[in-house]
Amino acid sequence: MPNLTLADLQGEIQANVRTALAEDVGGGDLTAQLIDPQREAEARVITREHATIAGRAWVDEVFRQVDPRVLVTWQVEDGQRVEPNQMLFQLKGPARALLTGERSALNFLQLLSGTATRSQHYADLVAGTAVKLLDTRKTLPGLRLAQKYAVTCGGCHNHRIGLYDAFLIKENHIAACGGIDRAIAEARRIAPGKPVEVEVENLDELRQALEAGADIVMLDELSLDDMRTAVALTAGRAKLEASGGINEGTLRNIAETGVDYISIGTLTKDVRAVDLSMRLTL
């Protein structure tokens, strides 16, 4: 599946920010009203740790919606690796607006940069191999597209976006349809042209999936030896995706079996936010 780009996300970004501001600002920022509305200020945002940045567009949109007079000047790009205490961006505008938008802007940036940083770490572990690391649907509710974009900033790739853009036929689907061949045939009938992926648990099921014409076969917790056999058996007839039992210790060995993809839920579901700080100057 193709990776998301910012061009795909403009409406999503606006909606994400509207939701964030509605839950944080509500009917108005009480504390900001203590400040003279004519008071101008500047601010600098830094990172306190090593990170890979993602989320600039969400920060820009926060301040656009809070007060379009706020000027945001970036010192880094999405996908850029940064060092502790490095300045990420500067703000200039009404002090009230800077303080009202601060938390929402940093929430987006720290979360999405956390996703990008974890993705970059995993991508570094398989550097030099041909494998592509994929995200999953294990995302934060309401922020799937944002997190999937952040994954690409860290050098990994997008799997299907949701249940609507590709088939992923798993054990229960196969049982309900009466077999792998029937499930694939029905998928082709329902949505010709949509990618069809089938999850298998052994080499016999792999053979069935290949004979039925699957586009992608997910190898669920196969041993390294079985993965190597699967690569030889498939011989390019379908793409192979490894899934299950994957961690930092096993990732490189799995990549070196020759599979095309490795899907990793932890890229988006176990995110640790990057530590950021904003300092205001009046």
Curated annotation (Swiss-Prot):
Say if the entry is tagged with keyword Cell division: no
EC class of the enzyme, as a word: transferase
- Listed InterPro entries: Aldolase_TIM (IPR013785), NadC (IPR004393), NadC/ModD (IPR027277), Nicotinate_pribotase-like_C (IPR036068), Quinolinate_PRibosylTase_N_sf (IPR037128), Quinolinate_PRibosylTrfase_C (IPR002638), Quinolinate_PRibosylTrfase_N (IPR022412)
Listed SUPFAM superfamilies? Nicotinate/Quinolinate PRTase C-terminal domain-like, Nicotinate/Quinolinate PRTase N-terminal domain-like
Catalytic activity reads:
nicotinate beta-D-ribonucleotide + CO2 + diphosphate = quinolinate + 5-phospho-alpha-D-ribose 1-diphosphate + 2 H(+)
> What EC number(s) has UniProt assigned to this enzyme?
2.4.2.19
Tell me the keywords, alphabetical order.
Glycosyltransferase, Pyridine nucleotide biosynthesis, Transferase
Supply one GO CC term from the record.
cytoplasm
Could you give a GO molecular-function term held by this entry? nicotinate-nucleotide diphosphorylase (carboxylating) activity
- How would you summarize the oligomeric state and partners of this protein? Hexamer formed by 3 homodimers.
Name of protein: Nicotinate-nucleotide pyrophosphorylase [carboxylating]
Protein species of origin: Pseudomonas aeruginosa (strain ATCC 15692 / DSM 22644 / CIP 104116 / JCM 14847 / LMG 12228 / 1C / PRS 101 / PAO1)
